[in-house]
């Protein structure tokens, strides 16, 4: 097992990062608004330059491997955007990956946790499965039962970022369950700060001619013995249930095609919509259930939302909204009642400053302790045996179970704590 980094070594590495990036950071800060209060500006500068050195809340690696046998399985969403693809090269410059956004982020106010920087796994490249073996080792150690890979498949059969999941399929030494999360939304270059780098759009609006192509592409995954199932039925998640009028027909047809291929009819879950529409029922789309993906933002009680003040944010161009997640997690909003199977979820943290600070970033400050509470409640209230965590490695949005400079392995440890506490209560 790869030896984890000790605090002293982490501090030295963090110090190197601070020194290396000091000039770059100061150039960035020159464009920020300096408060009238000189001491506030000095406080911010000191924080921005030294926040990676603070190991107050750092949790080290645990050699004790999870050995429980819970009735609930925790599955973490997995982002594959950690290698070069031609679309990102064309739109954002050669060599662009998720790490390009992660490393450019800076704090927007004193106390703002940015950037999020990985330890243990480092700034990995998913061109090969080398780092995946370490990811599996970490996941198993802390009680995670599987990865749910985002799968980018578009009308006409075009695919993006498919190499990691294809490599996973080929590497049979990766003895760990997995499944597909079909990210069926149009894909353009506009998710970043710029919208003028290209015009190519990959459409997720399905047509009848897409059915056979889609089924042909996913059959190798569904037939793999590691694929996650529900009562023997391969589980597939679909992201956007309400934006494609053809989707109900598409779901019905792919179910039939998959069954005709000799595989059990898939269990299809739709992402529970942010609108939290009480009339929403996945069965109306031909699906079997729904899955939670983060927080139900649009119906979050107004008192839980908190717009950051101009006095707090140093960057005059920043657009950032904070949410009181403790209030949300303690509210009834976290446990909606449905007549259909709803796969509960929890979120580690969320801060998409690295991607959206000038177009409307959101900040959900969720400490490891608060995340543990949320996950425990999801385990306790779930009527299904699968609970989903957002996310394993969405670093540019601050959602990562993977260890980081600030908290170390705290979110992984919180995952195991929640699972063990749930087991011990039964």
Give the residues covered by each predicted segment.
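Glycan-processing catalytic domains of CAZymes
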Residues: 33-426
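Membrane-proximal basic amphipathic "stem/tether" segments
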Residues: 1-54
């Amino acid at each position: 097992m790869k030896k984890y980094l000790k605090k002293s070594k982490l501090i030295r590495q963090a110090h190197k990062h601070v020194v290396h990036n000091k000039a770059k950071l100061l150039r960035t800060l020159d464009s920020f608004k300096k408060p009238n209060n000189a001491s506030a500006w000095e406080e911010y500068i000191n924080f921005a330059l030294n926040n990676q050195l603070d190991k107050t809340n750092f949790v080290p690696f645990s050699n004790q491997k999870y050995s429980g046998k819970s009735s609930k399985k925790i599955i973490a969403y997995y982002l594959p955007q950690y290698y070069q693809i031609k679309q990102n090269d064309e739109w954002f410059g050669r060599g662009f990956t998720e790490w390009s956004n992660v490393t450019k982020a800076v704090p927007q106010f004193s106390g703002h946790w940015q950037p999020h920087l990985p330890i243990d796994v480092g700034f990995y490249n998913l061109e090969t499965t080398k780092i995946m073996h370490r990811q599996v080792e970490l996941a198993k150690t802390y009680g995670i039962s599987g990865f749910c890979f985002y799968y980018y498949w578009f009308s006409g059969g075009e695919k993006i970022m498919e190499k990691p999941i294809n490599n996973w399929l080929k590497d049979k030494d990766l003895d760990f369950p997995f499944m597909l999360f079909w990210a069926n939304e149009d894909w353009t270059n506009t998710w970043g700060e710029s919208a003028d780098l290209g015009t190519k759009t990959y459409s997720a609006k399905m047509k009848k001619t897409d059915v056979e192509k889609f089924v042909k592409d996913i059959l190798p995954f569904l037939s793999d013995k590691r694929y996650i199932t529900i009562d023997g039925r391969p589980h597939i998640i679909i992201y956007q249930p309400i934006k494609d009028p053809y989707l109900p027909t598409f779901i019905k047809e792919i179910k039939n095609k998959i069954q005709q291929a000799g595989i059990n009819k898939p269990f299809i879950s739709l992402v529970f919509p942010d609108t939290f529409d009480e009339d929403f029922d996945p069965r109306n789309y031909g699906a079997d259930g729904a899955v939670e993906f983060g927080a139900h933002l649009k119906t979050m009680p107004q008192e839980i939302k908190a717009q950051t003040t101009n006095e707090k944010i140093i960057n005059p161009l920043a657009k950032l909204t904070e949410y009181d997640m403790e209030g949300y997690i303690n509210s009834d909003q976290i446990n909606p009642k449905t007549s259909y199977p709803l796969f509960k979820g929890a979120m580690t943290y969320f801060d998409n400053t690295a991607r959206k600070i000038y177009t409307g970033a959101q900040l959900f400050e969720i400490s490891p302790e608060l995340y543990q509470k949320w996950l425990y409640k999801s385990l306790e209230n779930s009527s299904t045996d699968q609970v989903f965590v957002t996310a394993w490695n969405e670093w540019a949005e601050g959602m990562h179970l993977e260890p980081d400079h600030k908290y170390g392995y705290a979110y992984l440890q919180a995952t195991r704590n929640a699972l063990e506490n749930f087991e011990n209560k039964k």
